[in-house]
From Swiss-Prot:
HAMAP family: MukB
Binding site for ATP: G34, G35, N36, G37, A38, G39, K40, S41
UniProt subunit comment: Homodimerization via its hinge domain. Binds to DNA via its C-terminal region. Interacts, and probably forms a ternary complex, with MukE and MukF via its C-terminal region. The complex formation is stimulated by calcium or magnesium. Interacts with tubulin-related protein FtsZ. Identified in a complex with SpoT; IscS and ACP. Interacts with the ParC subunit of topoisomerase IV.
Family recorded in the similarity comment: Belongs to the SMC family. MukB subfamily.
UniProt protein name: Chromosome partition protein MukB
GO terms (BP aspect): cell division; chromosome condensation; chromosome segregation; DNA replication; sister chromatid cohesion
């Protein structure tokens, strides 16, 4: 027999009053005796804390707080602990003799909430010799010890060999270990289970009949029939899911057209926009590539134009430079012509002026002679006039003197003044400041002598002048001629220079005679030189255009080569034209073929899509129409085979369903009639009696009873006989066994057990041999096992049936799809791929375009080469006639030589022309230059000086004469002399004076006439001189100008200059013409460059805009593609046939679909908002989001248990296949799942009956319990009247309420609740829902009422209530009920725990003073009978005779409070024996 586990000891560490105390627990009763505050409740609290370490439940209160709803803030635990680490440990030994120490580490948490920290732990494998206090304390000295923290305790235990230490983070794990090791009776899986356990302990602790326990006895004693509840829940869940699925199918059927419409329009809306963007992206890419090609071509053209522009600009610059030179040359030639013409005119002027000068020279010489004669006559007239003047003056003086004498007094002063004036004038003229009237006579003689001397000298010089005049005139003429020819020179050098000039003149005349021949020769050579230079220019230009330098000898061969090249290029150009026409014709044919293929491509793509769908659906590849027709025949055969297999699987599934239904009957009856017969006979089915048989024992009992497994056990067979008469509604073989259903055993047979078989000796002459069945069905566990296997098989069959049904309908739809394909697309599906051909043709078209472009480039190059060759030939035609000139290298030297000789000759001609006349004049008179006559100029100066001296001497003598004459007047300073003489003298003087004045007048008249004539002569001479000088100066200027002109004004110079000018003009005109051509070409080139630049700019802008648009679109397109691929909708959106529609058609298609979608999603707010957002043309990804949202919406609407795909399109295709099949299957499944109301009533009744039997068995254990007036205690289990009525209606009158159970809107639980409300309208259901009420009605415990009854004295059986029992009786009754609860838990948990473990049993009782000695003895007896341990807290006057008693006394020693404990074992006549180790000295925690 298995020994029951026991609690060995309780250890308290650092509790209030207990520093390290171990209480050894008795195998039956341990009594804690002591006064108030001794520590009894603290000890029990430590035990309970170690047993249930849940702070949410622990609440230690005094018995006076038994009815209180709240105690102290710390619920009694914080105050029972001391500061620091505390422990409460239970030392146990289980049925396996394993020592297990479980406990908790407690520690106060600082704070006003007075919390406690609890850590549960367990120790296994601890040797028996080790005491718990030794584990958690460390002795410091004889009087002090230290409590080890939990981590040190762990380290200490890990150091011990074979000892296991476990620390738990959850109370559930802690209790799970305690349950597995047999410390507690029930597995506490949840807080609710812990609460029940705690309430049980609390009820036993405080004693009496706990109202909490009494009210919830059903929860404590009646196990939860989780299997039945789970079955009902599974059934309802399956029904609910089935109905939801059916409803979903109905909704799906109603929404199928909406789905199709929504998917179709959404696909059209998004796919059209998707393909439009794809087409636009392709178009944009093509445009970008085209722009890039055009940009590259334009750049090449611009570069070519720029090179051309540079060449033309360079040529234009050369022509501009040459034009400048030519203009300069032309202007120089024109200027030279003008200079020649000017020089000729100047030469004519010079000749004319020279003739005039010769004439003027003659006239000037003649006028000089006339002037000289006039001067002589003028001098004579001046002398006569002066003599006449002197005579007049003398006569006037005489007359004045005479008058003065006449009137001295009047004239004396005047005379005196005149004398003074004459004296002053004489002083001034004679330079004699000391001159006086007295010495005037002396000075007069002197000055008269000087006058005479000067006059003589002047006359002598005049004579000399007359003689040298003639010789001086010839010398001056010759000298002037030499000076005019040679320039200024000394007079003594004139002779040598004149001879040299004459000799040079002869040489110059000889050279001047060669000017005309040299000029003609030079003109001819210059013409040849110009032609040579033109040829060299043409050759240089030709070499530059050819890009190569050629020798003169190579030009003829080059000319022939260029002519041959021209002929060849001409043939190539004509052939290229034909080739270009052929290429263009092929290009047009390709374009036409591409257009026809693009028209055929959508039809072919639609056929290919249909073919691909067929290939995907059937997993085959079709290469021809024959393959399609052959596969269609195979499809028909496969359809027939699948239908046959489906029917077979369906039959097997129905058989399994029937077997499951049969095995699911309550009580294990395979025939419903047996249940009715058992109720009719008042018996019990044998299968119900053995319903709890284990799965291991099921084969044995099944073989033991054999065919009588389904027998009915009745108490008395004789009472059944009358019922057997006329019995027809029964199985063919009905077995009846007599026996007590409450104590039935298998002793009715004599059995011999064999290997996997039994031999049953039914009678002496009848044995039955039965083997153990492979699949036993005897007992609930066996049936459940079989049902589980059948359910698994049914699931497989159902899945296979569904798969086959789906395959059949899929095959049928595939057959329809093949038929549609054959009718619509078979004709074009297996034709060649037009898109592949289009790609090939496009590739060929690109090649043709590239060939055309290359051909155009080659043709252009050939044309350029042809033009270059023609230009080269033209240039060579101009160069070849001048090859001899190009070969003449000495021509320039000869021209320079002739030009030098011509310059010398022209210089000589100019010399002769300029100085020929002077040389001719000089030649006859050159000899006068050999000797120079007197210095004629000096002589002239001496003569003029003598004349001046003579005049000065004459004036001085006249002034002195006047002074001398007025010498007398100086004496008349005071008065005037008296007038002397007579009147006659006066008259004579007057007459003579008149004559003298007349003569003087005549002389003056003659002098004035001669002076005027001389003045005229002088004027004529001056005019002639001025004219001569002017003309001479003009002539000199003209000669200088002619020299400055620097040209030779001969007869042929003008003609040569004009020819040169005309040639340069022609060259300038040609140059200007070429320059104009180049300027026009350059302007055109610049315009072309500007156009190309603008085009290039526009192309660059368009290209970059397009590239940016492509890049931007690429980012958006990548997002779209990523979204499409992530959501797996590319196959739906990338409809290749739409690629051949225009953007307008696609936009129109998308807009039409958008209008339809707006109506379709008008009632769906989410899709409406997403659709509205998707209308943004700049955000194409939003259309994909809308499409995904539509798919997601459809996925949510389509149940995945109905349709096996995530694709709504495929779901719609599968939907039509699945809907009808699922509807039938689910309808039948609902009928099978829906358990009948009678079955529910039978299940609940059988469960109630079984539990009633179990309670009866528990009551048998309490029959012998008695204390006080209580003779016995029992539990009474009754069915509530309202629920009994419900069971009767469910089993007998359920047809009246089928409106509830057949309603698809109500679950079975709700229908059950509605029926309960219908039967009991007086009951208020409150706020509970019908589902909650129905679930409660499916729990059999709610059908039962349990109450405790006691057999007390003469009153018989009474309901146990606190008011009807004494305190001791109430405590005993409550303890009995608690023991029953523990027994019930053990029975319930036996199958969950190992069979070799019997759990510990321990209860508490605080304040046992309320019991008398007999009641306590009864408790001892109860504990002994039930192998239960009990801890009692009692006052000091209680001394049980049995068990272990601890005397607790609380003492204070040196301010330290501790509990003194003395333990006693038993209570006999002998002296009490002190238990070892119970004395504890006061200890102080270190």
């Amino acid at each position: 027999m298995i020994e029951r586990g026991k609690f060995r000891s309780l250890t308290l560490i650092n509790w209030n009053g207990f520093f390290a105390r171990t209480f050894d627990l008795d195998e039956l009763v341990t009594t804690l005796s002591g006064g108030n505050g001794a520590g009894k409740s603290t000890t029990m609290a430590a035990f309970v804390t170690a047993l249930i370490p849940d702070l949410t439940l622990l609440h230690f209160r005094n018995t006076t707080e038994a009815g209180a709803t709240s105690g102290s803030r710390d619920k009694g635990l914080h105050g029972k602990l001391k500061a620091g680490v505390c422990y409460s440990m239970l030392d146990t030994i289980n049925s396996r003799h394993q020592r297990v120490v479980v406990g908790v580490r407690l520690q106060q948490v600082a704070g006003r909430d007075r919390k406690v920290d609890i850590k549960p732990f367990a120790i296994q494998g601890l040797p028996m010799s080790v005491q718990p206090t030794q584990l958690v304390t460390e002795t410091l000295n004889e009087r002090q010890a230290r409590v080890l923290p939990l981590n040190e305790l762990k380290d200490k235990l890990e150091a011990m060999e074979g000892v296991q230490f476990k620390q738990f983070n959850s109370i559930t794990d802690y209790h799970s270990l305690m349950f597995d090791l047999g410390i507690i009776a029930r597995r506490l899986r949840s807080a609710s289970d812990r609460s029940k356990f705690y309430r049980l302990i609390e009820a036993s602790l405080y004693g009496g009949i706990s109202s909490a326990i009494t009210r919830s006895l059903r929860d404590y004693l009646l196990p939860e029939n989780s299997g039945v509840r789970k079955a009902f829940q599974d059934m309802e869940a399956a029904l609910r899911e089935n109905r939801m699925t059916l409803e979903a199918i109905r909704v799906t059927q109603s929404d199928r057209d909406l789905f199709k419409h929504l998917i179709s329009e959404a696909t059209n809306y998004v796919a059209a926009d998707y393909m439009r963007h794809a087409n636009e992206r392709r178009v944009h890419l093509d445009k970008a590539l085209e722009f890039r090609r055009e940009l590259h071509t334009s750049r090449q053209q611009l570069a070519a134009e720029q090179y051309k522009h540079v060449d033309m600009a360079r040529e234009l610059a050369e022509h501009n430079g040459a034009e400048g030179d030519l203009e300069a040359d032309y202007q120089a030639a024109s200027d030279h012509l003008n200079l020649v013409q000017t020089a000729l005119r100047q030469q004519e002027k010079i000749e004319r002026y020279e003739a005039d000068l010769d004439e003027l020279q003659i006239r000037l010489e003649e006028q000089n002679e006339v002037v000289a004669e006039a001067i002589e006559r003028q001098q004579e007239n001046e002398a006569r006039a002066e003599a006449a003047e002197l005579e007049v003056d003398e006569l006037k003086s005489q007359l004045a003197d005479y008058q003065q004498a006449l009137d001295v007094q009047q004239t004396r002063a005047i005379q005196y003044n005149q004398a003074i004036a004459a004296l002053n004038r004489a002083k001034e003229l004679c330079h004699l400041p000391d001159l006086t009237a007295d010495c005037a006579a002396e000075w007069l003689e002197t000055f008269q002598a000087k006058e005479l001397e000067a006059t003589e000298k002047m006359l002598s010089l005049e004579q000399k002048m007359s003689m040298a005049q003639t010789a001086h005139s010839q010398f001056e003429q010759a000298y002037q001629l030499v000076v005019a020819i040679n320039g200024p020179l000394a007079r003594n050098e004139a002779w040598d220079v004149a001879r040299e000039l004459l000799r040079e003149g002869v040489d110059q005349r000889h050279l001047a005679e060669q000017v005309q021949p040299l000029r003609m020769r030079l003109s001819e050579l210059e013409q040849r030189l110009r032609e040579q230079q033109e040829a060299e220019r043409l050759l240089a230009d030709f070499c530059k255009r050819q890009g190569k330098n050629f020798d003169i000898d190579e030009l003829e061969a080059l000319h022939q080569e260029l002519e041959a090249r021209i002929a060849s290029l001409s043939d190539s150009v004509s052939n290229a034209r034909e080739e270009r026409m052929a290429l263009r014709q092929e290009q047009e044919q390709l374009q036409s073929r591409i257009q026809s293929l693009m028209q055929r491509a959508p039809v072919w793509l639609a056929a290919q899509n249909s073919l691909n769908q067929l290939s995907e659906q059937c997993g085959e590849e079709f290469t021809s129409s024959q393959d399609v027709t052959e596969y269609l025949q195979q499809l028909l055969e496969r359809e027939r085979e699948a239908i046959v297999e489906r029917d077979e699987v369906g039959a097997r599934k129905n058989a399994v369903d029937e077997e499951i239904e049969r095995l699911s009957q309550p009580g294990g009856s395979e025939d419903q009639r047996l249940n009715a017969l058992a109720e009719r006979f008042g018996g019990v089915l044998l299968s119900e009696i053995y319903d709890d048989v284990s799965l291991e024992d099921a084969p044995y009992f099944s073989a033991l009873y054999g065919p009588s497994r389904h027998a009915i056990v009745v108490p008395d067979l004789s009472q059944v006989t009358e019922h057997l008469e006329g019995l027809t509604d029964c199985p063919e073989d009905l077995y009846l066994i007599e026996g007590d259903p409450q104590s039935f055993d298998d002793s009715v047979f004599s059995v011999d057990e064999l290997e996997k078989a039994v031999v049953v000796k039914i009678a002496d002459r009848q044995w039955r041999y039965s083997r153990f069945p492979e699949v036993p069905l005897f007992g609930r566990a066996a049936r459940e096992s079989r049902i589980e296997s059948l359910h698994a098989e049914r699931e497989v069959l159902s899945e296979r049936f569904a798969t086959l049904s789906f395959d059949v309908q899929k095959t049928q739809r595939l057959h329809q799809a093949f038929s549609r394909f054959i009718g619509s697309h078979l004709a074009v599906a297996f034709e060649s791929d037009p898109e592949a051909e289009i790609r090939q043709l496009n590739s060929r078209r690109v090649e043709l375009e590239r060939a055309l472009s290359n051909h155009e480039n080659d043709n252009q190059q050939q044309r350029i080469q042809f033009e270059q060759a023609k230009e080269g030939v033209t240039a060579l035609n101009r160069i070849l006639p001048r090859l001899n000139l190009l070969a003449d290298d000495s021509l320039a030297d000869r021209v320079d030589e002739i030009r030098e000789r011509l310059d010398e000759a022209q210089e000589a001609a100019r010399f002769v022309q300029q100085f020929g006349n002077q040389l001719a004049k000089l030649e006859p008179i050159v000899s006068v230059l050999q000797s120079d006559p007197e210095q004629f100029e000096q002589l002239k100066e001496d003569y003029a000086y003598s004349q001046q001296m003579q005049r000065d001497a004459r004036q001085q003598a006249f002034a002195l004469t006047e002074v001398v004459q007025r010498r007398a007047h100086f004496s008349y300073s005071d008065s005037a002399e008296m007038l002397s003489g007579n009147s006659d003298l006066n008259e004579k003087l007057r007459e003579r004076l008149e004559q003298a004045e007349a003569e003087r007048t005549r002389a003056r008249e003659a002098l004035r006439g001669h002076a005027a004539q001389l003045s005229q002569y002088n004027q004529v001479l001056a005019s002639l001189k001025s004219s001569y000088d002017t003309k001479k100066e003009l002539l000199n200027d003209l000669q200088r100008e002619l020299q400055d002109i620097g040209v030779r004004a001969d007869s042929g110079a003008e003609e040569r200059a004009r020819i040169r000018r005309d040639e340069l003009h022609a060259q300038l005109s040609n140059n200007r013409s070429r320059r104009n051509q180049l300027e026009k070409a350059l302007t055109f080139c610049e315009a072309e460059m500007d156009n190309l630049t603008r085009k290039l700019r526009k192309l660059e802008r368009d290209y970059f805009e397009m590239r940016e648009q492509v890049v931007t679109a690429k980012a958006g397109w990548c997002a779209v593609m990523r979204m499409v691929k992530d959501n797996g909708v590319e196959r739906r959106l990338h409809r290749r046939e739409l690629a051949y529609l225009s953007a307008d058609d696609l936009r129109s298609m998308s807009d039409k679909a958008l209008g339809a979608l707006r109506l379709a999603v008008a009632d769906n707010e989410h899709l409406r908002d997403v659709l509205r957002m998707s209308e943004d043309p700049k955000r194409p990804e939003r259309k994909i989001q809308f499409f995904v949202a539509v798919y997601q919406h459809l996925r949510e609407r389509i149940r995945q248990d109905i349709i096996r795909t995530d694709d709504p399109v495929e779901a719609i295709e599968q939907m039509e296949i699945e809907l009808s099949r699922l509807t039938e299957e689910l309808t039948s499944r609902e009928q099978k799942l829906a358990i009948s109301s009678r079955s529910v009533a039978n299940i609940i009744r059988k469960t109630i009956q079984r539990e009633q039997n179990r309670i009866r068995m528990l009551n048998q254990g309490l029959q012998n319990v008695s204390f006080g007036q209580v003779n016995s205690v029992r539990l009474n289990v009754n069915v509530r009247e309202t629920h009994a009525m419900l069971l009767d209606v469910l089993s007998e009158q359920h047809e009246q309420h089928q409106d509830l159970f057949n309603s698809n809107r109500l679950t079975f639980s709700e229908a059950l609740a509605k029926l309960y409300q219908r039967l009991n309208p007086q009951i208020d259901m409150g706020q509970r829902t019908p589902q909650t009420i129905g679930e409660e009605l499916l729990d059999y415990r709610n059908y039962l009422e349990m109450e405790v009854e006691v057999n007390r004295g003469s009153d018989g059986w009474l309901r146990a209530e606190s008011g009807a029992l004494s305190t001791g009786e109430a405590i005993g009754t409550g303890m009995s009920i608690l023991v029953m609860v523990v027994q019930s838990w053990e029975d319930e948990s036996r199958r969950l725990r190992g069979k070799d473990i019997s759990p510990c049993r321990l209860l508490f009782l605080d304040e046992a003073a309320r019991l008398d000695a007999r009641s306590i003895a009864t408790l001892f007896e109860l504990c002994e009978r039930l192998q239960m341990q009990l801890i009692i807290a009692a006052p000091e006057n209680i001394s049980p005779e049995k068990g272990t008693t601890y005397k607790l006394v609380r003492k204070v020693f040196q301010n330290t409070e501790h509990v003194h404990v003395v333990g006693l074992r038993g209570f006999a006549p002998q002296l009490p024996e002190t238990l070892p180790g119970t004395d504890e000295a006061p200890s102080q925690a270190s």
